[in-house]
C-alpha cells in the first residue's frame, strides 16, 4: 500500500485513564502539544472532516485521550493539550501526567507528532516530550503550526532554529511548516504518516 485514505478515518473511543485503554493490537501515532497549538484542527484537516476531532473554544478543556482509526491496526491518538495557563496548577499537573504516562508506557506508539506554534517553539513542556522520545528512541515529526501567521522568511528562520536544536538530540526527526486554516503542509504530513505505517506495520507483519 503506497497511500492511505485519511478521509475514511473514524473515531474509535475516548479514555480518561491510561489504565482503561483496552486497545492492544496495531500501532499508534501520537499527536501532542500545548493546548493552543491546534492538534484537533490538524487531525480534522488531515482527514478532511471538520468535526472528527472535537475541540473546545476554551483551550485546555479537552481532557480525554481520543483514538481514531485510519485503517485496521493503524491509529491516530489525540492527547490532552498541556500547559494551559488559566487552568489550576493541580489540574494542569494531572493533564501533563496523563500525557507523559501514555507516551512513556504505551508500547504501540511508533511516532510522536509534536505540534508547536511556529511563533513560540520549544517551550519547556515541548522539551519534556522530546526527552521522552530520546529515551524511547522514537522518531518525532514536528508540525510548526500557524505558519500562515508569519512571513515566509521568518518561517524559514524558525524552522532552521528548531532543526539546529533537535539535530543534537534526535537521530530521526522531520519538520513540516503547517497551517490547518490555509491547508499548508497537509500532503507532507500524509506522506510522513504513510511512511511510518509502511515501516512499522506493513513490513513487520
Curated annotation (Swiss-Prot):
Keywords: Cell cycle, Cell division, GTP-binding, Magnesium, Metal-binding, Nucleotide-binding, Septation. The keyword Magnesium applies. It holds the Pfam family MMR_HSR1. Its cofactor is Mg(2+). Mg(2+) binds at residues 40, 62. Residues 25-199 form the EngB-type G domain. One of its GO terms (molecular function) is metal ion binding. Necessary for normal cell division and for the maintenance of normal septation. Belongs to the TRAFAC class TrmE-Era-EngA-EngB-Septin-like GTPase superfamily. EngB GTPase family. PANTHER family: ENGB-TYPE G DOMAIN-CONTAINING PROTEIN (PTHR11649:SF13), MSS1/TRME-RELATED GTP-BINDING PROTEIN (PTHR11649). This is Probable GTP-binding protein EngB. It comes from Buchnera aphidicola subsp. Acyrthosiphon pisum (strain APS).
Amino acid at each position: 500500500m503506497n497511500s492511505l485514505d485519511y478521509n475514511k478515518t473514524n473515531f474509535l473511543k475516548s479514555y480518561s485513564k491510561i489504565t482503561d485503554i483496552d486497545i492492544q493490537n496495531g500501532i499508534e501515532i501520537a499527536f501532542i502539544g500545548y493546548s493552543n497549538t491546534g492538534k484537533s484542527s490538524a487531525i480534522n484537516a488531515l482527514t478532511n472532516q471538520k468535526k472528527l476531532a472535537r475541540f473546545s473554544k476554551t483551550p485546555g478543556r479537552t481532557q480525554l485521550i481520543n483514538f481514531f482509526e485510519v485503517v485496521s491496526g493503524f491509529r491516530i491518538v489525540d492527547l490532552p493539550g498541556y500547559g494551559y495557563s488559566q487552568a489550576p496548577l493541580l489540574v494542569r499537573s494531572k493533564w501533563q501526567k496523563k500525557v507523559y504516562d501514555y507516551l512513556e508506557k504505551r508500547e504501540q506508539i511508533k511516532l510522536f507528532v509534536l505540534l508547536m506554534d511556529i511563533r513560540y517553539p520549544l517551550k519547556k513542556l515541548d522539551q519534556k516530550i522530546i526527552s521522552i522520545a530520546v529515551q524511547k528512541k522514537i522518531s518525532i515529526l514536528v508540525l510548526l503550526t500557524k505558519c500562515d501567521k508569519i512571513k515566509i522568511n521568518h518561517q524559514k528562520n524558525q524552522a532552521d532554529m528548531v532543526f539546529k536544536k533537535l539535530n543534537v538530540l534526535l537521530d530521526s526527526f522531520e519538520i513540516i511548516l503547517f497551517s490547518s486554516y490555509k491547508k499548508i503542509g497537509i500532503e507532507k504530513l500524509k506522506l510522513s504518516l504513510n511512511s511510518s505505517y509502511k515501516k512499522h506495520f506493513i513490513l513487520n507483519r
